[in-house]
Amino acid sequence: KHFILRDKSRVAVTYASPVHFIKNGKWVENEPGLVQKNGRLHNTQGAFSASFALSGEDEGGSVIQWEGKSVSFRALGNRVGGTSQARVSNASPERTGLLSAQELMKSNSGTVSYDGVFTDASLEYKIAWNGIKEDIIISSRGGQYKYGFVYTLSHGLAMSLNSAGCGDKRQ
C-alpha cells in the first residue's frame, strides 16, 4: 500500500499479514481492534480469537484460541497495592496526516496496555490479523529485569525453548 504523509512525502508499506479480506462478497479493510464484552476485551477481527482481562491483576489473564486450541497467560506481577486497568487504543480508519511509517503501523492494530503491572514495567499487547506482539516496557533503568508469566496450554500444545532461548509452541 502507498500512503501520503503530512509533509506530502509518500511511503510504501508492506504487511506480513492480510490488510483486506472478503466480507459479504466485498473486499473490506482489515482493522483489528478491541471491544468490551462480557467483562473482557475481545479482538474484532483476525485469524484467531483473543480476549484480555480488564485489569492486569485479573486471574483470567489473556486467552488466545485458534483451530480448537488455546493458550492462556497472565503476568505474575510484583506490584505493591493498587490495580492496573487495561487501556485500549484501536486501529484508526483515518490514515491521512500521519507523520511517519511508525505511526502508520501503529494505526493498523488494536492495542491493550497494562501500566504498572510490574513495579517497574508495563505490558502492551498489539493485536494484528495473524498474531499478538507482547512488549514489556521498562519504566526505569536498573530495575528488575526478570518477569514471570503463567501459561496454560490445551489440546496437545507444549512449550519448549527455541534457539534464541524464547518460548516456542509445539504441537
Show the residue positions of the predicted features.
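Residues that cap or anchor secondary-structure elements
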Residues: 1-171
